[in-house]
Amino acid sequence: PAPQTSIELFLIVDHSMYAKYNSNSSKITTTLKARVNIMNAIYSSLNLVITLSGIEMWSAADLITVQSSSRNTLKLFASWRETDLLKRTSNDNAQLLTATNFNGNTVGLAYLKTMCNSKYSVGLIQDHSAIPLLMAVTMAHELGHNLGMNHDGAGCSCATCIMAPVLSSGPAKSFSDCSKHDYQSFLTIHKPQCLLN
């Protein structure tokens, strides 16, 4: 079995999402906590615990330029985390949640094998569904990329697996054997220190 690991996850709510929830910060907080609870259920099979280390809402204005290019937005967010967020608070990974509609059918984006990196341990999430499970799966999927998981391909096809290339609406949500193998390899080769404290 995988060693016990923990991730301190920090969530940023951009201005578009803040407005989408009618500037109701307590409702947003409740919503995000529920999603993280589901993420923990998903990740329990990997013996990994996710702690919500903080939530910051960009209630007045965005602190980066959130744009329809998910790639550009993720790049800006990565730089902002390193130069701003980490100067104020410690976390292992940060996700930016937005109501912005990205180009194409993208609902999330993250760097691969970057967990614990001060700049690139980030993910970008479009608030695309009112269904908590689907949002938790999207967040878990992008976090999976940070943890070294590739999309499920031939040989590990699994329609309702977390790392399927396309989000399925099916209820069964688990990691494929390929994802588990990718994660184990990441732990062994990269030895991400922040997960082991």
Curated annotation (Swiss-Prot):
InterPro entries, alphabetized: MetalloPept_cat_dom_sf, Peptidase_M12B, Reprolysin_adamalysin
Which tissues carry this protein?
Expressed by the venom gland.
Top-level taxon of the source organism: Eukaryota
Cofactors required: Zn(2+)
* Cellular component GO terms held in the UniProt record: extracellular region; plasma membrane
Q: Which GO terms describe its molecular function?
A: calcium ion binding; metalloendopeptidase activity; toxin activity; zinc ion binding
Tell me where in this chain the Peptidase M12B domain is found. 5-197
Cofactor notes: Binds 1 zinc ion per subunit.
Task: List this protein's GO terms for biological process.
Answer: proteolysis
Subcellular location(s) of the protein: Secreted
List residues binding Zn(2+): 141, 145, 151
Q: Which residues are glycosylated?
A: 24
The active site of this protein is located at: 142
- Keyword Disulfide bond: yes or no? yes
Disulfide pairings:
116-194, 156-178, 158-161
Query: So what does this one do?
Result: This protein is an alkaline zinc metalloprotease from snake venom that possesses weak hemorrhagic activity.
Assembly, per entry: Monomer.
Similarity section: Belongs to the venom metalloproteinase (M12B) family. P-I subfamily.
Q: What is this protein called?
A: Snake venom metalloproteinase acutolysin-C
Native species: Deinagkistrodon acutus (Hundred-pace snake)
